[in-house]
Amino acid sequence: MLKITELTGGYGDKTIVKGVSFEVPKGKMLGILGPNGSGKSTMMKLISGVLPAKSGMVEIEGRAISEFGAKELAKKMAVLPQLHAHAFAHTVRETVSLGRYPHQSGWFASWSHEDEAAVAEALRLMDIQQYEHTPIDQLSGGEQQRVFVAQALAQNAKILLLDEPTNHLDINHQRELLDTIKRQAIEKDLTIISIFHDINLASMYCDQLLLLDKGHVMRIGEPHEVVREQDIERVYQARVSNHPHPELPKPQITLLPGVERPRSASAIRAEDFSISAEMVLYESDVPLKTVSSAVINAGAGWYRTFINRHVDMDYNIDDSLSEMTRFIEERGFKPTDTVGMMTAIKTEHVIIKEFPSSFGSVVIAVTAGVGNAVDVSKAIERPLGVGTINTWILVNGALSDEAFIQAMITATEAKTKALHQEGVKDPLTGTIATGTSTDSCLVAATQQGAILPYAGPITELGGLIGSGVYQCTIEAIALYRKAKMQ
Ligand SMILES: Nc1ncnc2c1ncn2[C@@H]1O[C@H](COP(=O)(O)OP(=O)(O)OP(=O)(O)O)[C@@H](O)[C@H]1O
């Protein structure tokens, strides 16, 4: 275990690191974050003893590092420095072998089996055996970086201090290196402190993070306690947005540009929709921020093409994703820029309406096939046939994440109310239907103009969505019923 208490130090009269305290238990990895010049490397130098501290303590398992001899300390602690000016005249194997120096004794050091095994293991872990006899200066920056990490690993110390270990590495080698280091920490009970410039990598791999600001600890804790928008923005002086990692409970940030997106003169208009026998199509000049439960590109994203495609009643293709992607490509659209839904009802039965407001307008488009309507409170009791109400809400305005979700809720409530009003029943239970079995909803916004933080019924936007979806759904049901009667 490594314990740092009130560590203070710097260069000459210049105090860089000011009263830093923390502990890292065995088997854990602490990531150091902070902007350029905040004192990260200086702190590492103080911890490793390369730079004497002005005050404070660094203890390894309860013993101050000042009590260790140089070789004894090197057996406990391996350091990957930020710059590797040394050793460029050596081969890869020779460079990695230098990591074994604390384990050599006497003037005529004897190279043991243990030394050989440690070097071989380090070469293997960093996947650099193939360069074993290559002079280091003939390797790429990323390959060299792996050699220096191998040198630190060959030292077989229980504490690893790494200054930007992923420097120069491509994304796969970043992952491989950090996976290896993390695995080593767990399997060999290593204590690891590592400096990171990449906040997202640090969040993904570290158990604890320390955010350094002008030599002070601004925040320390688990990644979710440290990777917070306001703190990161203040310390790094950059606009960021925080979002969840898709697979791990580790927050990630996205850098936001200082330069604004050029404003588009065009807005979403109902008359710009086109309706053919194949599809209802809306093509936007600018990408719209979209949240949907579509077939293609469901979830959140930015898209310019919106398709509600007509398919036969008996459309039943196992891989509808591939089939729909092909359909989009064959029509000259880009699947990466398109949200696509399907409906069995005729596209001419779509209802598209524009609702003006004080902030801009909302365009709503609904197709409603209610032959297989469902009372959702009884859905679990029996199998369901396919049926679809597709609801699109396109907003000329800038929605918050909250507003996107509220818009979905408001739209769903309005749809259900319309079914109730029209007396649409679940054919299997005879009770009032709440929707159909495969309804889709889409909310998209220009993200320009008025900022719309909410979209519940209490807001103007929510009110428009509520009455708009209600009206459109009622009219769409009427068209559907009329067509069925004929
Ligand atoms: N050898 C030195 N002598 C005098 N001042 C130094 C020395 N090394 C670093 N400094 C100063 O100490 C401050 C902190 O530097 P340090 O290298 O610790 O920052 P850092 O957080 O690691 O930055 P970076 O992200 O750029 O690597 C800087 O203002 C730097 O100019």
Regions found by a protein language model. Give the residues of each.
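ABC ATPase nucleotide-binding domains
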Residues: 237-270
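Helix-to-loop junction immediately C-terminal to a conserved catalytic motif
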Residues: 48
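Catalytic Walker B motif of ABC-type/P-loop ATPase nucleotide-binding domains
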Residues: 160-164
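Conserved ABC ATPase "signature" region
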Residues: 97, 113-131
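The feature captures the beta-strand-to-loop junction immediately N-terminal to the Walker
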Residues: 33-35
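Alpha/propeptide regions of enzymes that mature by internal proteolysis
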Residues: 262-486
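Conserved ABC transporter NBD signature motif
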Residues: 56-64, 73
